[in-house]
């Protein structure tokens, strides 16, 4: 099965609301490898590697996030050049 690697930049009220931990649970459910980390500007960066349908499903989830979050936007970009950063599972940094 073909796999893709995507980078998502999630903006809004996404820090301090269990966004990264919730993203990790959703990624594990979808069998996606990757990571989520807070950035200094208040956004969250997510790197995701998995099947095309699974990564697309994670993208849709990121647009909503957990109940405590308020997602204002999600920017998506190809991240094939960052494949070496993807851990074996899904990590919260």
For each of these PLM feature ranges, what is it?
Residues 1-93:
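Intrinsically disordered, low-complexity, mixed-charge
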């Amino acid at each position: 099965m073909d796999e893709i690697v995507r980078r998502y930049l999630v903006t809004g009220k996404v820090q301090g609301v269990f966004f990264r931990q919730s993203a990790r649970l959703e990624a594990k459910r979808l069998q996606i490898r990757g990571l989520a980390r807070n950035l200094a500007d208040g956004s969250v960066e997510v790197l995701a590697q998995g099947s095309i349908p699974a990564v697309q499903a994670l993208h849709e989830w990121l647009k909503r996030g957990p109940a405590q979050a308020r997602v204002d936007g999600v920017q998506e970009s190809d991240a094939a050049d960052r494949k070496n950063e993807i851990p074996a599972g899904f990590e919260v940094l």
